[in-house]
A protein has these predicted regions:
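Conserved acidic, metal-coordinating active-site core of Asp-based
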Residues: 109-223, 227-232
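Short, structured coil segments at secondary-structure junctions
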Residues: 60-62, 70, 78, 179, ...
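Mg2+-dependent phosphoryl-transfer enzymes with acidic/Ser/Thr/Gly-rich catalytic loops
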Residues: 3-8, 25, 195-272
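N-terminal glycine-/serine-/threonine-rich phosphate-binding loop
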Residues: 2-38
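Active-site metal-binding loops of divalent metal-dependent hydrolases
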Residues: 13, 48, 224-226
C-alpha cells in the first residue's frame, strides 16, 4: 500500500499536460512517476488517437485505461489493445454523415476536414488546406478521397473533425443542424478553430464512467482545460483545471491550479 493507492489521475494532454507546441515537462514526468510508484493509477483522456498520444507520453507509467478520440475509444496501454469503440456513424441508416461531408467540402473551401477511423486519420480536403499541425504530429495520416470512405459499415467513422476560422465553423455547425447530423452527434469546439463530432452520447466523461466500472472504489481525479473536457471534469470525484483553462472550465473545476507551463501535475500531486 502506497500513499496514493486507490487514486487515479486522468489528464487531458494539450493545454493541460502539454503546453501548446511543447512536450511534457521533466518536472511533470517525475511527479507522475512518484505518484505511480506510491500506488497511484495514471492515464490520459484526449481527442488524439493512441498513436498520436504515444509520441508525447512515451516513458510515462500509464497503468490505467486511456480515453481517446474525445471519448470514442477506450484503450489499454499496457496490452496495446482497443477495449471499446463507439463509432460516430453507428445507426446512421440514411448515410447522412457522408452527405454532410460532401456538402461541407463544397461550402467550406478553406477548411481542413478529417475523418478518423480506427486505423488512420483520413484528410478529405486538398493538401493546401492542411492544418499546420499535421506534419508535426506523431501519427500516420493520409489524403483520401471522401468517396472511398462512404461505406461506413466497412470503415466506421469514430470522429469527424474540421479546422477553419471560427466564423466559418459557426456556419458549419448550422449546416450540420440543417442536414440532421447534429442531432446524431455530440459536437463541440476543442479549440477556437477546431470543431469535432463524435457519437451522440460520447464524451470523455461518458467513457470515464466505463473506467470507473472497471476500477471500483477508486477515487478519480480529472484534469482538463477546454470545452471538450467539461464532461470529464463533471464525472470525476475531483476536478482540476490550470490557470490557462477556458474560463468556463476553470470556473467549474474544484481545484484551480497553475498555468500549464508551470507543471500542473507537480502542483496537484503535492496536494493529494
Amino acid at each position: 500500500m502506497g500513499k496514493f493507492t486507490g487514486k487515479l489521475i486522468i489528464s487531458d494532454l494539450d493545454g493541460t499536460l502539454i503546453p501548446r507546441g511543447g512536450v511534457i515537462s521533466e518536472e511533470n514526468r517525475r511527479a507522475i512517476a512518484y505518484f505511480v510508484g506510491e500506488g497511484g493509477l495514471f492515464s490520459v483522456a484526449t481527442g488524439r488517437t493512441p498513436e498520436a498520444a504515444a509520441g508525447y507520453v512515451e516513458g510515462l507509467p500509464l497503468n490505467a485505461p486511456g480515453i481517446f478520440f474525445n471519448g470514442a475509444m477506450l484503450y489499454d496501454w499496457q496490452r496495446k489493445q482497443v477495449l471499446k469503440t463507439l463509432p460516430l456513424t453507428a445507426g446512421d441508416e440514411n448515410n447522412l454523415w457522408p452527405a454532410f461531408a460532401r456538402e461541407a467540402l463544397r461550402r467550406f473551401p478553406e477548411a481542413c476536414l478529417e475523418v478518423y477511423a480506427e486505423d488512420n486519420c483520413h484528410v478529405v480536403t486538398p493538401e493546401a488546406n492542411d492544418d499546420p499541425r499535421l506534419p508535426y504530429e506523431y501519427y500516420r495520416y493520409a489524403h483520401t478521397d471522401l468517396e472511398r470512405l462512404t461505406d461506413t459499415g466497412k470503415t466506421p467513422w469514430l470522429k469527424f473533425f474540421a479546422c477553419d476560422r471560427h466564423e466559418h465553423l459557426e456556419r458549419y455547425v448550422a449546416l450540420a443542424e440543417e442536414m440532421g447530423v447534429a442531432a446524431l452527434a455530440n459536437g463541440f469546439y476543442s479549440e477556437d478553430n477546431y470543431y469535432e463530432f463524435v457519437a451522440k452520447d460520447v464524451s470523455k466523461g461518458a467513457m470515464l464512467e466505463t473506467v470507473r466500472e472497471m476500477l471500483p472504489g477508486v477515487e478519480i481525479i480529472a484534469c482538463g482545460d477546454y470545452l471538450n473536457d467539461r464532461e470529464l471534469l463533471a464525472a470525476a470525484d475531483i476536478s482540476v483545471a490550470p490557470a490557462t483553462a477556458h474560463p468556463a472550465i476553470r470556473a467549474a473545476a474544484k481545484l484551480k491550479g497553475p498555468a500549464v507551463e508551470e507543471h500542473l501535475l507537480v502542483w496537484l500531486i503535492d496536494r493529494l
